[in-house]
């Protein structure tokens, strides 16, 4: 028979077991499960399945029963090993703090979709004194990227002066994750390029890039020599006249000499062209050739002389590459025109000396004269065309701060030319020295001297067998022959330095200094201008018809000259026209002189 207190003791034991079971179950409900890296929101929290079991009734009782028998030490180890999502681990490593943090609220990020309100709540939970560096999620990267874009747009709106003060150097509490910016930007640096400069080369402080964006050729902001191909910088040209030095005296001498050549050449060549064009009785084939020569001399002096003098004084071409190409082209074309004109004059004088009466009775029409001039022009322009291809503008630094580099027009073939033109340019460059010497020096001098000697012999024979009426014409032919020889000697004397310069450049360039080459070049240039200036003066001195017409042209505006010329008788006028026309008494033009005299003018 059981004792009377046995049921009571059994009941108390059952109650103790039940109480122990309930306490263990309550402790297991707070144990966090290992967090899955792929879950988001409250689904990662162990409270959700626990609450679902409490609401829906007991489920998985077998697993719950197994958890009852798990030792307490293992449960505490799992609690210690579980990492918190929102709160950082305490420095002291106290397990009680971990349990309080786990029991105080749900673990992991909120379950609501990411948005501005969600991250504002997250910002308030993060302490300001510690920053955790861990791998962010996609939503966190999206938020930080959007915030960076907003900050860059705001920074563009802020002025440059206040932008540097607004850049933060330390992270704020609202930043979830903080790491250094992109490569090339140091942490805490105040230098933040704006979005408008992306993809461009930025110069370091104190330097300014040239306009083409090249980082190699930098241009300093202030002071120092300027380099690079910037078009905004202002370069000072050298003043050749101040201060007074040996170079400035040379510049004054060059300037005075060029003014004399310019004035004399312009007036003389214009006078020759006006005399031939405005006087009908001066329109012979020989005078037309001389007028053509005067036109090219005028072109050389009017166009090339100022450019060459400007380059000599400032070491800079006024029109840069255009003047570097066009000035040598016009000069070589002028040499060709002079060469062919002298040859044509020699042939014309030889025909006149062979049969004087027949020559002066023959009249050449305008088309014949134009055809001869066209042959001279086309031949000279075509032969000078390779000079345009060979000439290149070269710049050399003088070594002075703020001064423009010296520009030189050198013979250099560009590799960008087409293959055919490039081969022709190479061939011409190899044969240029002897072509220049043979065509522009030997041909006019030898041919003219030979023809002049033959013409002089013909004139002597004609003078012995001539009648009284032809002696005046033979004397005029002798004057014209001497004029052609004088023009040839002047031309040969002025072209010799150019050939010497070419020979020195081709064979002795290494042993001659650049200063000597520049001196030879400027001497050859001035002798070419001197030839163009002296040619009309030589015509007025040696050719009587030109001198008489020039004096009449100069005195045509004077009333005394006009009144004096009106008192001359008609016979004297006929003799004057006969002399100027170089006509014989048997010429048919003499009978028509009264008709053409009223058409022509003396100026």
Swiss-Prot record:
CC terms in the record's Gene Ontology section: cell surface; cytoplasm; dendrite; endoplasmic reticulum; endoplasmic reticulum membrane; plasma membrane; receptor complex; synapse
Basic and acidic residues bias locations: 51-79, 145-158, 165-175
UniProt GO molecular function: G protein-coupled peptide receptor activity; heat shock protein binding; Hsp70 protein binding; neuropeptide binding; neuropeptide receptor activity; PDZ domain binding; peptide binding; prosaposin receptor activity
TM ranges: 256-276, 290-310, 326-346, 370-390, 434-454, 484-504, 522-542
Residues linked to a glycan: 36, 212, 229
Keyword set, alphabetical order: Cell membrane, Cell projection, Disulfide bond, Endoplasmic reticulum, G-protein coupled receptor, Glycoprotein, Membrane, Receptor, Signal, Synapse, Transducer, Transmembrane, Transmembrane helix, Ubl conjugation
Pfam families associated with the record: 7tm_1
Domain of life: Eukaryota
Topological region Extracellular: 27-255, 311-325, 391-433, 505-521
PTM annotation: The N-terminus is cleaved by ADAM10 metalloproteinase; mediating limited proteolysis leading to the release of receptor ectodomain by shedding. In addition, cleaved by FURIN between Arg-53 and Asp-54.
Region (Disordered): 39-232
Topology Cytoplasmic: residue spans: 277-289, 347-369, 455-483, 543-603
Location of the protein in the cell: Cell projection, Dendrite; Synapse; Cell membrane; Endoplasmic reticulum membrane
Residue numbers marked as site, Cleavage: 53-54, 164-165
Residue ranges of coiled coil: none
Gene Ontology terms: biological process: adenylate cyclase-inhibiting G protein-coupled receptor signaling pathway; cellular response to reactive oxygen species; dendrite development; dopamine biosynthetic process; locomotion involved in locomotory behavior; neuropeptide signaling pathway; positive regulation of dopamine metabolic process; positive regulation of MAPK cascade
Disulphide bridges: 324-409
Tissue specificity remark: Highly expressed in the brain. High levels of expression were seen in fiber tracts such as the corpus callosum, anterior commissure, fornix, internal capsule, cerebral peduncles, and stria terminalis. Additionally, moderate levels of expression were seen in the pyramidal tracts and cerebellar peduncles, as well as in the spinal tract of the trigeminal nerve and the spinal fasciculi.
Subunit and interaction comment: Forms a complex with PRKN, STUB1 and HSP70. The amount of STUB1 in the complex increases during ER stress. STUB1 promotes the dissociation of HSP70 from PRKN, thus facilitating PRKN-mediated GPR37 ubiquitination. Interacts with PACRG.
Protein known as: Prosaposin receptor GPR37
Gene that encodes it: Gpr37
């Amino acid at each position: 028979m059981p004792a009377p207190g046995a049921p009571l003791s059994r009941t108390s034991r059952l109650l103790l077991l039940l109480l122990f079971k309930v306490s263990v179950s309550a402790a297991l409900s707070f144990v966090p499960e290992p967090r899955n890296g792929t879950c988001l929101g409250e689904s990662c929290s162990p409270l959700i399945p626990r609450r679902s079991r409490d609401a829906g009734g007991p489920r998985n009782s077998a697993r719950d029963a197994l958890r009852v028998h798990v030792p307490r030490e293992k449960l505490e180890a799992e609690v210690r090993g579980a990492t918190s999502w929102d709160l950082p681990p305490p420095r002291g490593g106290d397990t009680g703090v971990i349990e309080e943090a786990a029991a105080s609220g749900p673990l992991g990020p909120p379950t609501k979709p990411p948005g501005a309100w969600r991250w504002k709540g997250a910002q308030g939970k993060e302490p300001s004194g510690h920053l955790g560096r861990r791998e962010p999620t996609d939503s966190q990267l999206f938020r930080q990227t959007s915030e960076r874009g907003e900050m860059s747009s705001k920074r563009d709106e802020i002025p440059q002066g206040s932008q540097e003060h607004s850049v933060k150097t330390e992270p704020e509490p609202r930043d979830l994750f903080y790491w250094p910016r992109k490569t090339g930007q140091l942490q805490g640096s105040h230098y933040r390029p704006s979005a408008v400069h992306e993809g461009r080369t930025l110069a370091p402080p104190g330097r300014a890039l040239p306009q083409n964006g090249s980082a190699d050729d930098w241009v300093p902001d202030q002071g120092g020599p300027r380099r690079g191909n910037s078009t905004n910088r202002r370069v000072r040209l050298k003043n050749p006249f101040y201060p007074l030095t040996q170079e400035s005296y040379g510049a004054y001498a060059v300037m005075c000499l060029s003014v004399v050549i310019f004035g004399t050449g312009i007036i003389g060549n214009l006078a020759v062209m006006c005399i031939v064009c405005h006087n009908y009785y001066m329109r012979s084939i020989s005078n037309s050739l001389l007028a053509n020569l005067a036109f090219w001399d005028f072109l050389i002096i009017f166009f090339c002389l100022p450019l060459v003098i400007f380059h000599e004084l400032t070491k800079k071409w006024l029109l840069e590459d255009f003047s570097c190409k066009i000035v040598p082209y016009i000069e070589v074309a002028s040499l060709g025109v002079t060469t062919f004109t002298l040859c044509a004059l020699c042939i014309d004088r030889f025909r006149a000396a062979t049969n004087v009466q027949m020559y002066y009775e023959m009249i050449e029409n305008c088309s014949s004269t134009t055809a001869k001039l066209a042959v001279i022009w086309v031949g000279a322009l075509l032969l000078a065309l390779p000079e345009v291809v060979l000439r290149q503008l070269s710049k050399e630094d003088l070594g002075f701060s703020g001064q423009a580099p010296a520009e030189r027009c050198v013979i250099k073939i560009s590799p960008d030319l087409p293959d055919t033109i490039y081969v022709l340019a190479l061939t011409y460059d190899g044969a240029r020295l002897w072509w220049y010497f043979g065509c522009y020096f030997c041909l006019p001098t030898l041919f003219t001297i030979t023809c002049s000697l033959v013409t002089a012999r013909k004139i002597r024979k004609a003078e012995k067998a001539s009648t009284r009426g032809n002696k005046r014409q033979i004397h005029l032919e002798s004057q014209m022959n001497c004029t052609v020889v004088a023009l040839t000697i002047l031309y040969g004397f002025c072209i010799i330095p150019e050939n010497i310069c070419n020979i020195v450049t081709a064979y002795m360039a290494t042993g001659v200094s650049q200063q000597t080459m520049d001196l030879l070049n400027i001497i050859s240039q001035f002798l070419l201008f001197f030839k163009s200036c002296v040619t009309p003066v030589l015509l007025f001195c040696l050719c009587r018809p030109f001198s008489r017409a020039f004096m009449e042209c100069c005195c045509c505006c004077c009333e005394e000259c006009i009144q004096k010329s009106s008192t001359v008788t008609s016979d004297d006028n006929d003799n004057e026209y006969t002399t100027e026309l170089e006509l014989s008494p048997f010429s048919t033009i003499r009978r028509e002189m009264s008709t053409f005299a009223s058409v022509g003018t003396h100026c």
